[in-house]
Regions:
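Residue-identity detector for glutamine
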Residues: 6, 45, 50, 110, ...
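Metalloprotease/metallohydrolase-associated module, dominated by Zn2+-dependent proteases
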Residues: 5-15, 186-240
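Generic structural signal for well-ordered, non-membrane alpha-helices
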Residues: 30, 37, 163-169, 226-230, ...
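N-terminal low-structure segments adjacent to metalloprotease catalytic domains
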Residues: 1-71, 293-331
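Pan-zinc metallopeptidase signature
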Residues: 214-331
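Acidic/His-rich structured neighborhood in mature extracellular/periplasmic domains
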Residues: 53-212
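Phenylalanine-focused residue identity feature
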Residues: 3, 25, 30, 73-78, ...
Length: 331
């Protein structure tokens, strides 16, 4: 599977598409161009024997994957790990206003200005009475994987692993059922995030003092955004939509004043991040459950093999309930 991103309903015809038609990202055009370039580059490098920086990163990641035996038939690394550093698409996220729920998403062109994003959001919100937000994608499992070119080195490694894992899982039931429902989407994204962080940490062993300082800043943001999500959920559960939206706006302004660059916080913002159980914006508890399963499966490849053939969320729950120690850990 070439295409892997948070778009559970984008294969369906949706009236929203008509209103963003001029800004839709052309996946097929991108693939044709970049697969052609990939083949040409591979041939040129074979002739020159001079690997570039991307090749070096690919080799480092591939070695870590092989070391953990995340292989097809326990022998082959597939697909071959390849990525491209470039501008990534934007994504339009839709949620109802009375709850936080991802109901629709579609990729938009890369170079949208803030004003253009706001025009799209306002237009969709007024027309369909929904919450909408346009966000920048942090990576996407095209082939080669597309990773933002302005990312720092550690994030390039983490996000490249993340997108390769989507490609790997697409060969199995887990990845093939990512869009079955929001629970399967969240399971896929949370699992891939969990594994990619572990593999990236194995590669980036040496932490600097600046990383520790940054961690304190991240913890401050995490605490504030979790608080925002909790209060918002509570207000929406009481159908206090206007109050919830005013609260999210005030929290966005507060975070901006503290130096965090967030353009917009709304229901759609939280709906997007809710698929990623390792983020502070999410309230799904899948990550803690995955960690419980991991305690019984110390080797990463054994852990992956236990989960890769899940084709619906009830099978994941069966795994949680089938072992007494895992069940105790979860509860």
């Amino acid at each position: 599977m070439i295409f892997m991103i948070q778009i559970p309903e984008s294969t369906k015809i949706n009236p929203i598409n008509i209103h963003v038609a001029n800004n839709i990202f052309n996946i097929y055009e991108w693939e044709i161009k970049n697969i052609t370039n990939l083949i040409v580059n591979e041939l040129n490098q074979n002739k020159s024997h001079q690997p570039d920086e991307s090749n070096e990163i690919e080799k480092i990641i591939e070695n870590e994957i092989k070391k953990n035996n995340i292989l097809i038939f326990n022998k082959f690394l597939f697909p071959k790990l390849r990525f491209k550093l470039d501008n990534t698409p934007n994504i339009l996220i839709i949620s109802p206003t009375n709850e936080i729920k991802l109901t629709y998403s579609i990729l938009l062109k890369q170079n949208l200005t803030i004003k253009e994003k706001e025009i799209i959001e306002n237009k969709i919100e007024k027309k369909f009475n929904v919450s909408a937000i346009v966000l920048k994608i942090g990576g996407i499992a095209f082939y080669p994987s597309l990773i933002p070119k302005d990312m720092e080195h550690t994030k390039i490694i983490n996000n490249t692993i993340h997108e390769w894992l989507h490609q790997y899982f697409s060969l199995y039931d887990l990845g093939q059922n990512i869009y079955k429902d929001n629970k399967m989407l969240a399971l896929n994204e949370t699992l891939v995030s969990y594994i990619s962080e572990e593999l990236a940490n194995n590669i980036m062993i040496n932490e600097t003092q600046s990383t520790k300082i940054k961690t304190k800043e991240i913890n401050s943001f995490n605490s504030e955004i979790r608080f925002t999500r909790s209060i918002t959920d509570n207000l929406l559960s009481k159908n206090k939509i206007d109050i919830a939206e005013k609260f999210m706006l005030s929290q966005k302004n507060k975070l901006n004043d503290q130096g965090y660059q967030i353009r917009k916080i709304n229901q759609a913002y939280f709906a997007f991040y809710n698929s990623y159980g390792n983020t502070p914006q999410s309230t799904n508890n899948i990550l803690s459950k995955l960690k419980c399963i991991r305690t019984k499966n110390a080797k990463l490849n054994v852990f992956i093999n236990k989960l890769k053939n899940i084709n619906n969320f009830s099978k994941f729950e069966n795994i949680l309930n089938s072992d007494l120690d895992i069940k105790k850990c979860v509860n």
